[in-house]
């Protein structure tokens, strides 16, 4: 079980809301979010209701303003707790529909293009665990939650293009 607290103002001030499960519409509880405290679990935040828009991965810790979670604004309108798993494995493909060169990953990768010599990833298959895909190396840029399943095209994970800069396993240990 996880617990996250949203605050309307910076530095954990103003009205707050405690959440312990997925919530498709946080607008019912607050109009803006400028700081967050994650007491337990790993969470994915979304800038719009129903798990839409920019995504932000948070793990246990304090985030005194939205820049600390790489937010673009004070808009957090839905959230999802990410289940903990002990093993992680995914396969990356250079073409859509699992075609072309395939590479397997079981650990974090700070620079996908450098490690696999693939400039773009068009499809992937998450076999075990949850992952966060970042569009830029070193865990920067837009973030996308990858749950176990098939992603036949980059649109399936919400990407605007096939850029994959880095991948990180969702664990509460780093």
From Swiss-Prot:
SUPFAM superfamilies: gamma-Crystallin-like
Keywords: Eye lens protein, Repeat
Pfam families: Crystall (PF00030)
Tagged with keyword Repeat: yes
Biological process terms in GO annotation: lens development in camera-type eye; visual perception
GO molecular function, one term: structural constituent of eye lens
Matching InterPro entries: Beta/Gamma-Crystallin (IPR050252), Beta/gamma_crystallin (IPR001064), G_crystallin-like (IPR011024)
Residue ranges of every copy of the Beta/gamma crystallin 'Greek key' domain listed in the record: 2-40, 41-83, 88-128, 129-171
Stretches for region Connecting peptide: 84-87
Classification via PANTHER family: BETA/GAMMA CRYSTALLIN (PTHR11818), GAMMA-CRYSTALLIN A (PTHR11818:SF123)
Subunit structure comment from the entry: Monomer.
UniProt family annotation: Belongs to the beta/gamma-crystallin family.
Domain notes: Has a two-domain beta-structure, folded into four very similar Greek key motifs.
Job description of the protein: Crystallins are the dominant structural components of the vertebrate eye lens.
Name of this protein: Gamma-crystallin A
Name of encoding gene: CRYGA
């Amino acid at each position: 079980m996880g617990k996250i607290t949203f605050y309307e103002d910076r530095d954990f001030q103003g009205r707050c809301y405690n959440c312990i499960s997925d919530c498709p519409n946080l607008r019912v509880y607050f109009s803006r979010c400028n700081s967050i405290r994650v007491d337990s679990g790993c969470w994915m935040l979304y800038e719009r209701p129903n798990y839409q828009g920019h995504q932000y991965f948070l793990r246990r810790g304090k985030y005194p303003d939205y820049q600390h979670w790489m937010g673009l604004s004070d808009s957090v309108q839905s959230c999802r707790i990410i289940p903990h798993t002990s093993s992680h494995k995914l396969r990356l493909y250079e073409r859509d529909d699992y075609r072309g060169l395939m590479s397997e990953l079981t650990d974090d990768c700070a620079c996908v293009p450098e490690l696999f010599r693939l400039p773009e990833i068009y499809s992937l298959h998450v076999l075990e665990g949850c992952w966060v895909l970042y569009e830029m190396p070193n865990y920067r840029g837009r973030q996308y939650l990858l749950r176990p399943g098939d992603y036949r095209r980059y649109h399936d994970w919400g990407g605007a293009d096939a850029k994959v800069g880095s991948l990180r396993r969702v664990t509460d240990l780093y």
